[in-house]
UniProtKB/Swiss-Prot annotation:
Residues 609-784 are cytoplasmic. Interacts with LY96, TLR1 and TLR6 (via extracellular domain). TLR2 seems to exist in heterodimers with either TLR1 or TLR6 before stimulation by the ligand. The heterodimers form bigger oligomers in response to their corresponding ligands as well as further heterotypic associations with other receptors such as CD14 and/or CD36. Binds MYD88 (via TIR domain). Interacts with TICAM1. Interacts with CNPY3. Interacts with ATG16L1. Interacts with PPP1R11. Interacts with TICAM2. Interacts with TIRAP. This is Toll-like receptor 2. It comes from the Eukaryota. The record marks 349 as: Interaction with bacterial lipopeptide.
């Protein structure tokens, strides 16, 4: 019994483990190229069943705690492995041994407390390694990265427990494109720890305090291109000139991101610019200046310039004591060599005239997303200000008058590129004055409704996208590039206005078509972006766009952004794929063919009507319909005649001289209705026939060869037949005046054939001795 229980328990464990493995494998989604996505699936282990077909595996943001030797042993072709943001605390020694093709490994933000070089000893192809955010204190007792000759990006450290950097830590790394070290609580830096790396393109340091910053600079200043300092409080920073004054430096760019300065530490940073002579570019991003800008008492006057700094970028600068800030006149002399200045989102409302005049080498000035207005711009662009300025960016400020803005910039004689986008100009005056060398103008997102001759004729590049323009009719003879997307244009501009245009971007308007002739009229056009419009996919438009193989070289967003808006059955389809029917594309030909077919049909109908008496049948149909509208049975008081006599005019002698004499002069007499005598003059003959038949008790048909040839006799026969069959009575009396062969009766007298087949008829005897009996039978038939 215990053995049976043990066996059952083992099988239950096996089944549950198989179900778990199946569930985890199903948590992965893999495409045919071997890219598997399993991030954010609440996995607690690496799914089993992974094969050599997996090229990329993303298991980030799960609950994985352990990586074993078997988990990835079959993934020999794996190139990308993401295990970040898990709970991994243990990685077995040979877990990555089989991943010889691995190029990207992310183990960041786990719970690894110890790092082992054995993890990486077979990863010769590894180019990217991220170990940030784990809980280790050091990078291990031996060199971690000595077996990674192709490593180009390395991220190590954490914000709390990583406290030591030793000389062995980066041994074996010769060249890195990017090295990021998160060491906010760094306490020990052994000199020359970073010196083993002969070349670093970009070093990112997260340091809370600058205590060890100079020691690190000493080691890297000769092998580094760009140093980025993040999340650092430089209040106590002090630069020692003796440290690096005699060393060959290669640092070209300094970036301070989320760094705090004081007036004193800012001066120390400026000293650094002087002594690290290779620095060409300095960037301050989201920094805070905890001071009032009073540098006069801080020996700043002994610094003559900012070294070789040519580019200065400041974004989102915070100055808590802004309203106590000094005029910065003490730093004016330092700016003479600066060529490019960017100050974005820093609440700048004025550049003092004196500072503008000191910026004698300035070629590029970007004051985007600030508070500049025409009133302050007048002071900033004063006489002799920015004498060599070529590009001025005033995007998203508080400018309102285009005319005034142009006049204020007349002092900038070398200005050729002006960006005043995202200002609320709303309207444009008829005339404006601009610097004489203006070649580029950006007026996008300025809410203008129309363009006027205010724009300078010297323009080569014009951007008026994202406005309310519904037409473009300006003559700009030198314009080469036009950006006019996101407006309300209904057609392409006239090419005669823009004779040298080579680039036009006119997407997201309400253009519904353009033709080959329009494109050909732009003789120098090389690039056209016209997608996102509401195209009417007419036959001509489709023929042009689908038939021009070279069109794709001009239309840069072809074919993805070109979609039909109408006709409705192709709406949403790509213009390249839309197809119209023959009737839509050749309407004139189809209409002509239809008319010809209709004419032939009418002609054929006419021939058939003539051949088969169609016109006669139509007349009879009309007469029958008229008869159908009459009451089905006349009331008794409307019966005026004993019999209506239907006969041919050629048989009138027999009817009038024999029948009338025998019936109307008999005692009691019969009252007959004859068309010659009793039809009402002026009344339509069809109505006379119908009324006479309906007012007669019987209808007598005098049949002869002449009868079957008579049209009116046929009408009378039809109406009588209507009463005979539709009213279900016995009103018809047939008199055969002469023998008639039934086969000789025309087909159109079908009713006569039916009556002769269904009713007994009286035959007029030639023998006079039998004629008395004929009249007796006829009188009896009328009375019945």
């Amino acid at each position: 019994m215990p053995r049976a229980l043990w066996t059952a328990w083992v099988w239950a464990v096996i089944i549950l483990s198989m179900e778990g493995a199946s569930h985890q494998a199903s948590s992965l989604s893999c495409d045919p190229t071997g890219v598997c996505d399993g991030h954010s699936r609440s996995l607690n282990s690496i799914p089993s069943g992974l094969t050599d077909g997996v090229k990329s595996l993303d298991l980030s943001n799960n609950e994985i705690t352990y990586v074993s030797n078997r988990d990835l042993q079959r993934c020999v072709n794996l190139k990308t492995l993401r295990l970040g943001a898990n709970e991994i605390h243990t990685v077995e020694e040979d877990s990555f041994f089989h991943l010889r093709n691995l190029e990207y490994l992310d183990l960041s933000y786990n719970r690894l407390s110890n790092l082992s070089s054995s993890w990486f000893r077979s990863l010769y192809a590894l180019k990217f390694l991220n170990l940030l955010g784990n809980v280790y204190k050091t990078l291990g007792e031996t060199s971690l990265f000595s077996h990674l000759p192709n490593l180009r990006t390395l991220k190590v450290g954490n914000s709390n427990s990583f406290t030591e950097i030793h000389e062995k830590d980066f041994t074996g790394l010769i060249f890195l494109e990017e090295l990021e070290i998160s060491a906010q609580n760094l306490q020990i830096y052994v000199p020359k720890s970073l010196k083993s790396i002969q070349n670093i393109s970009h070093l990112i340091l997260h340091l809370k305090q600058p205590v060890l910053l100079v020691d690190i600079l000493v080691d890297i200043v000769s092998s580094l291109d760009c140093l980025e300092l993040r999340d650092t409080n430089l209040h106590t920073f002090h630069f020692s000139e003796a440290s690096i004054s005699e060393m060959n430096t290669s640092v070209k760019k300094l970036i301070f991101r989320n760094v705090q300065f004081t007036d004193e530490s800012f001066v120390e940073v400026v000293k650094l610019f002087n002594y690290v002579s290779g620095i060409l570019e300095v960037e301050f991003d989201d920094c805070t200046h905890d001071g009032i800008g009073d540098f006069r008492a801080l020996s700043l006057d002994r610094i003559r310039h900012l070294g070789n700094v040519e580019t200065l970028t400041i974004r989102k600068l915070h100055i808590p004591q802004f309203f106590l800030f000094h005029d910065l006149s003490s730093i004016y002399p330092l700016t003479g060599k600066v060529k490019r200045v960017t100050i974005e989102s820093s609440k700048v409302f004025l550049v003092p005239c004196l500072l503008s005049q000191h910026l004698k080498s300035l070629e590029y000035l970007d004051l985007s997303e600030n508070l500049m207005s025409e009133e302050t711009l007048k002071n900033s662009a004063c006489k002799d200000a920015w004498p060599f300025l070529q590009t001025l960016v005033l995007r998203q400020n508080r400018l309102k008058s285009l005319e005034k803005t142009g006049e204020l910039l007349l002092t900038l004689e070398n200005l050729n590129n002006l960006d005043i986008s995202k200002n609320n100009f709303l309207s444009m005056p008829e005339t404006c004055r601009w610097p004489g060398k203006m070649k580029q103008l950006n007026l996008s997102s300025t809410r203008v409704h129309s363009l006027t001759q205010c724009l300078p004729q010297t323009l080569e590049i014009l951007d008026v996208s994202n406005n309310n323009l519904d037409s473009f009719s300006l003559i700009l003879p030198q314009l080469k590039e036009l950006y006019i997307s996101r407006n309300k244009l209904k057609t392409l501009p006239d090419a005669s206005f823009l004779p040298v245009l080579s680039v036009m971007r006119i997407s997201r308007n309400i253009i519904n078509t353009f033709s080959k002739e329009q494109l050909d009229s732009f003789q120098q056009l090389k690039t056209l972006e016209a997608g996102g419009n509401n195209f009417i996919c007419s036959c001509d438009f489709l023929s042009f766009t689908q038939g021009q193989q070279a069109l794709g070289r001009v239309l840069v967003d072809w074919p993805a952004e070109y979609r039909c808006d109408s006709p409705s059955h192709v709406r949403g389809q790509r213009v390249q794929d839309a197809r119209l029917s023959l009737s839509e594309c050749h309407r004139a030909a189809v209409v002509s063919a239809a008319c010809c077919a209709l004419f032939l049909l009418l002609l054929l109908t006419g021939v058939l009507c003539h051949r088969f008496h169609g016109l006669w049948y139509m007349k009879m149909m009309w007469a029958w319909l008229q008869a159908k509208r009459k009451p089905r049975k006349a009331p008794r008081r409307d019966i005026c005649y004993d019999a209506f006599v239907s006969y041919s005019e050629q048989d009138s002698y027999w009817v009038e001289n024999l029948m009338v004499q025998e019936l109307e002069h008999f005692n009691p007499p019969f009252k007959l209705c004859l068309h010659k005598r009793d039809f009402i003059p002026g009344k339509w003959i069809i109505d006379n026939i119908i009324d006479s038949i309906e007012k007669s008790h019987k209808t007598i048909f005098v049949l002869s060869e002449n009868f079957v040839k008579s049209e009116w006799c046929k009408y009378e026969l039809d109406f009588s037949h209507f009463r005979l069959f539709d009213e279900n009575n016995d009103a018809a009396i047939l008199i055969l005046l002469e023998p008639i062969d039934k086969k000789a009766i025309p087909q159109r007298f079908c009713k006569l054939r039916k009556i002769m087949n269904t009713k007994t008829y009286l035959e007029w005897p030639v023998d006079e001795t039998q004629q008395e009996g004929f009249w007796l039978n006829l009188r009896a038939a009328i009375r019945s």
